[in-house]
Amino acid sequence: YLQVFHLDTGKQLRQLSEGMKVKFQLALALSHGAKLLILDEPSSGLDPVSRAELKDIFRQLAAKGAAILFSTHITTDLLDCADDITYIQKGHIVASKPMADFLADHPDCDSLEDIMVRLEKEDITL
């Protein structure tokens, strides 16, 4: 994965930019061949090319049977990668369902981002 993310193996971690550190940490996590990856904001700090590479890797891993659970505020990452979505607000699960069902539940919204903005503005009581 070092080659996939175009990381220089001759550099020490302290010599890397913040974006390169994120790539290094992801390469390390992916190198174990785990069947389940749990990642917090994995595309945070990545440039658009690196984000696209990461999403390609996620799709390849999922095609090989891996499960990837990740948190994000970037709705395009969800649309590009997620089969299912769990929406959490104030520590409570508000919705957990297939992406298509989640989108269908909000026909008056034009996009996933619109849904997220609306849900954040609503006072949801459980």
Residue locations for each model-derived region?
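A short, surface-exposed alpha-helical micro-motif characterized by mixed small hydrophobic
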Residues: 78-80
